[in-house]
Amino acid sequence: MAASSLAKFAEIEIDLGRYKGNYSYLKNNDRILPTEEEIIKYYWSIPNPLWQRAFGLMAAYGISNHELFYVDLDSLLEPPGHLISTYRKNHYGIRRIYCLCPEWYKEWELYKHIDLPQVTGQNNRDLGHRVSTAFRRYGLCKPGDLRHCWAIRAMGFIPDSMAARMMAHKTQVHNDTYKRWIDENDEDRFYQLLINRSDRPKPPTV
């Protein structure tokens, strides 16, 4: 692929080739993810400010439905708003997660301290179930969809290993999970990013 060659020349850590092939790793290959426009509409449709904040954090930072309750909200008080998570800290330490749509950090006022919904649960599955139930109640997408969208948004902008760490899983799991969503539109986007770099290879002037 042309985009793969350009990525190599521009020293960007993107290997588009690995996103082709067998997609059987996913349980549901027909899963349709919401567009960013739909995510924004979902956000503004939530009448409960606590659940609106929960949705906003999950959309902006790609955290899972139970990781929501392992984050340090005070870490968002100052820009650029890197979210601190202690989820799976025994494996990955305390992690910083980037908001890849900084406009959401500002427009949704994620820097303001608003409490999360008060939910109960004996384990992560219980906590996640409470979140999933709330999403269904408000007619939203699945919580995992927001996490998938963050991962796809990260492709081409940050190294896969860094994105995987932010999501608290291994790089191979990251690649196997999200490779199926690379399409021609993504390849075209990577191409535009690469050719607009000031340090890209250029032919000599004669």
Language-model regions, residue ranges each:
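Catalytic-site neighborhood detector that most strongly recognizes the C-terminal catalytic loop/helix
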Residues: L33, K89-H91, M167-Q192
